[in-house]
Every structure is written in structure tokens, then in C-alpha cells.
């Protein structure tokens, strides 16, 4: 990995010390007293640099924080709207920290601020990592499992695209009210929009190469602060939309790296292959790290969105680019955020495929997307989720469906959404449903309260489960009537089930359905829930004989969920 540069290329300046636990700012301490923050909360230093001769985005900054243990952590800084600069840092130890900040505004590096602060204990769960108990699971630093469930609400900063035109912070709260925990957001690379009227594209952080819009950046600040307040974790897609020559919506000509917009790249291929252009793109990674990397609620950085569908960019070009960018991020990130890349998946390739990226140690989350008329019917959708997760499982990584959806989802039942999120989770993956106004029938549907309720019920069901030791997908047990299918997450002595009724007669009441579980002899408690309303339907104790356990399901419509747990043997 390349060494971290001594001075970071980003903005800073002088004298205004602020310590904060997002989103509030702590009051200034009395003279001689050190400010305090909670462990894993944000500490922030703001200052001016009036004598600078460089553009704010070219100011070099290095902030060195020394922990109570003696560990030194180095971060950068950034310019803010209205002038001035800031450094953000998240302490991970309790006790007294010291810091020194140097900045170079054009006349050489000099110290612009120094000081200390105290860190008190907190119950914050910390950053999300790859789990230690299972290669396929994510977990908070405190060890609790994290199962991504939420939305690909890619331009949430544009209220006109949100349900009820909610501003982004309110939309984040709305997601949380429906039990979601993950939001995927695009940093747009197509920086001009043509509809409903021409103008700057919302979400374009880098309108010119190496120049970052502080007002747009502040919108991402607000999203992360709302995410921390409401328990949502954000995946930021760093280069999204803008690699298709001659197209309005994904215009390469509106990409700041394109020569058509004054950039250095004649073609998207130049962007992915030329080392000098990669070096320019690295500055965007470092800006995002310096501004947002402090946050434990930045779940992951997603390097690129659907390169196969945005310019038909081949895997032989974007996979090496992705590996390089992931290496740059990991080398610079003191917090260890996860890295992923939102490719379409092995079912849609251009030149080669993404298996080298799936197996790369620099790729932390194996992500793919799922759309298409082949999967409008819910049984086909559920089967494809199972197939794709199984196809991905052998790489030994957490699996995420970063987008799926169908604009024709029935608004009375939202059954496509329902079956998608339950079958994905019970196949062993995290899952994000796409939501947008109905522009494209193949994918776009708003996240109405009725649709959101399906996430709430699934989230509540998952919260009841015992996840330690981890639950893994099991072989599908035999089920009746013919065509009924059961998904199982389990471990020895404990199994969660989701049962989907047969395609024939789907939507009519199902009675006398069974699932045969191959479990050891003994006593078991079996509980069933209505997976649409969350109502508990039944609970009973059963005895398994040599042939296993036959579960007789309560009557249901379409699908039902249950838990089977072994009871202690009675002497």
C-alpha cells in the first residue's frame, strides 16, 4: 500500500475550537479546562487561514491526534461554505487526547492549532466491520450483528424525488420509522441536469476536477448527522452516473473528468486506465474521507455504480481501477471503513466479469443489483435471490443486493418488495430496495408508508432472533403443498423460517401446509408470525422423533414466518 502523505491535500485554517457529538456543538470550555466528548463522537476543530495564496481545495492539511495509549492518528481537513476550514476526528479511546494541526496555504506548512480534549465512555456501538464470528456477516465494534436493510434512495438530497417531498434529514427519520438501517446515496458525476429545467445537478460534489462545492458537501453532512440521530448507516457511492457518451441522464459530456467539460479524459476508458487521471480521482476519495470519514454511520464507500449499464464499461477496465481506488482508500483511512463497488452482477457483463473483484481482498462487501422483467413475478424473484446469494457465498464475504425494485409493484400489497426483502435476507444477504418517482416501470416505485411497513415488520422479526452464534442459510426443507418453498436461517438448535406459498393459487388462503425439518430427537418450541402484519399466530411445543420434525403451519396468505428452537432436555 502506498504511504500516507505527510500533508493532506485539502483545506484548513485557525482559531475556533469546537467539540461536538453530532449534531450538537459543545459550548466552549472555560479557560484551562479541556473540552469533553463521548467516545466515538465527533471532535471538530475549525479555523481560518487568511494569508493563504492557494485555492481552498489546494490547501494542504495534516492533523495529528495522539491517543491516551500513545497511538498517533493522522487525518486531513476541508474548506467549508462561507470560508474557513475544519478538521474532524472520532476518538476510540477514553482519556485525554492531544492534537497538532499544520496547514500550508501556499507559503509552506505551519502549525495553525493545537490543544487537547477529554473523552468519556459512551454506549455508542462504533463502526461497522466484517464480523469475526462469520465471514458473511457484518457487525458493530461491540460485536452485535448488522444486517443491511433499507433503501437505494440515491438522490435523497433532492426532495422532489422523495416521498412527500421530504427534505433529506426528515426522509432519513422516515426510513428509521419503518425499521430500516441502511441508505445508499449517489455522489453524482454527471454535473448538469436537463430536466425539469437546465442547471447544476443536485448531489454533484466535484463540478470541476479537484474543486469541491462546499454547499453540496454540507448536504451530505446533514444526511450523515440525521443518520446518526436516527440509527441509519450510509453507503456513499463516490462516482455515480456520468459515463455514457451522448446520453442525457448519464452524460459523459457532463462529467468533470471529460474533455467536453474541461477535464483531462477524452473517453471513459481514459478515466479508468490513465494513471494521471487516477491520481486526480484520488483527491475526491481523500476529500470524502477527510470530511465524512469521522462518522461511524458512514457504513461503506461504494466506488462506482453499475459501470456495465453506464457506458457499457467493461470489467477488464473498471476492476483494476476499483482495486487501485480501494487500495488508496484503505491505506489512507484510519477508521477502517468498508469498501464495495455496485456492479450489476455476473448475470450482465461486458468484457470478462467481476469475479476478480469479488475475490479481491480490497473488496469488503460483495455487491450486486437485481432488476428485469424476468423477476417481476415474485416466485422468480425469490428464486433468483437464492441463486445469486448462493453464487456469491463461496467468496467468503458479506453479500449485499444494493438495488432491486419493480415499478409495477401492486400498491395494495407491495408483494414484490415484500418477497424481495424477505427472500434476500433469508438467503443470507443484506438488501436495499430502490425507490424513486415512477419514471421507469422496470425499477421505480416510491417508498410510501404502505411499502415501508413491510420493512418495519421484517426488522421487528429479525430483532427477535438470537444471532449469536451467527445464523446461516440452510438447505431448503421439504414443504407441502407442492410448490411451497421454505427458506431457513439457522444453527444447531435454532432456526428461523420464511415460507412462500406455491405459485399456483398464490394469494388464496393456504391451509394444512407442512415443513419437514431434519432435526435431532428432542423437544422444540415452534412459533409463527404473520409476516405482513407482525401478528404472532401460534406457538406450540413439539417432540421430534427419529424422522425429524413435521411443522404444521397455521393458515396463511402468500407467506408466513416462524422460529424453531430446541428446548433443554428435562432430566
Predicted regions and their residues:
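Non-catalytic, glycine-rich low-complexity segments
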Residues: 25-69, 75-76, 116-121, 479-488
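Aromatic- and carboxylate-lined catalytic core of secreted/periplasmic carbohydrate-active enzymes
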Residues: 32-37, 54-57, 396-399, 406-409, ...
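Extended acidic/polar, glycine-enriched regions
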Residues: 64, 71-133
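Catalytic-core region of carbohydrate-active enzymes that cleave or remodel glycosidic bonds
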Residues: 232, 328, 332-338, 360-442
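Active-site mouth of glycoside hydrolases
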Residues: 58-60, 122-365, 372-377, 384
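Sec-dependent N-terminal signal peptides
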Residues: 9-17
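Bacterial N-terminal signal peptides that target proteins for export
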Residues: 2-10
